[in-house]
């Protein structure tokens, strides 16, 4: 038995970590596993809330969005790919069409971590590769990893958030996440995503 959430306003937040799209994805996954129509309907309701907010942000050229997984473009794109795969249709591709060019035109971030940084961008291209088997997507993920490694060699460190006196070794904001994602890029069929 699952207690269904009471709809509440999420302050027009379209991010994966704090917005409606992640809730929609959960219900669409439940529907896919159970074939229970109420989960599909709830997924659709939450997706419509997301899409309405998305259209408002689009009018403002996504000025409040960053490129992170949790609060930005990257998380939205990954969720869209997941929903498109579950729904087995192209209905949601307008979101990808609007946001992917922003991702492709971004410069390297000052952070290499999995939640907020450059290594997370590899996950979008690995998801695309997983669903399309387009080798160009896998190649793009490999290029991003190589760029991160090259900068690490120049700077003699990965660009991470550090607390004075402590190395950042955690999964989402530290070295563990970078290492895990590098393993995933080297073998995406065997190493599963931790961002979806």
Tell me what each language-model feature is.
Residues 31-34, 39, 46-74, 78-85:
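Alpha-helical scaffold segments of alpha-solenoid architecture
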Residues 82, 86-90, 94, 98-102, ...:
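Terminal, non-catalytic domain-edge segments
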Residues 106-114, 125, 130-136, 140:
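Intrinsically disordered, low-complexity segments enriched in Gly and acidic/Ser/Thr residues
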Residues 1-10, 38-59, 87-110, 140-157:
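Long, well-ordered core segments of solenoidal/helical folds
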Residues 10, 14, 37, 135:
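Charge-dense, low-complexity intrinsically disordered segments
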Residues 12-31, 65-82, 113-129, 170-184:
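Well-ordered alpha-helical segments within folded domains of soluble proteins
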Residues 20, 36, 73, 88-89, ...:
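Alpha-helix initiation and capping sites
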């Amino acid at each position: 038995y699952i207690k269904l959430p009471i709809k509440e306003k999420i302050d027009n937040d379209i991010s994966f970590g704090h917005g409606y799209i992640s809730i929609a994805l959960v219900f669409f996954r439940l529907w896919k596993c159970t074939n229970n129509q109420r989960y599909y309907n709830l997924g659709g309701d939450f997706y419509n809330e997301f899409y309405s907010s998305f259209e408002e942000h689009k009018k403002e050229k996504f000025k409040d969005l960053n490129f992170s997984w949790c609060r930005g473009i990257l998380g939205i794109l990954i969720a869209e790919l997941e929903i498109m795969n579950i729904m087995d249709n192209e209905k949601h591709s307008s979101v990808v069409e609007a946001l992917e060019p922003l991702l492709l035109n971004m410069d390297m971030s000052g952070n290499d971590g999995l939640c907020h940084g450059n290594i997370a961008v590899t996950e979008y291209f690995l998801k695309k590769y997983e669903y399309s088997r387009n080798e160009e997507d896998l190649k793009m993920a490999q290029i991003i990893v190589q760029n991160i490694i090259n900068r690490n060699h120049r700077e003699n460190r990965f660009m991470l958030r550090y607390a004075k006196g402590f190395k950042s070794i955690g999964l989402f904001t530290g070295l563990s996440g970078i290492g895990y994602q590098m393993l995933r890029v080297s073998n995406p069929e065997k190493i599963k995503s931790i961002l979806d």
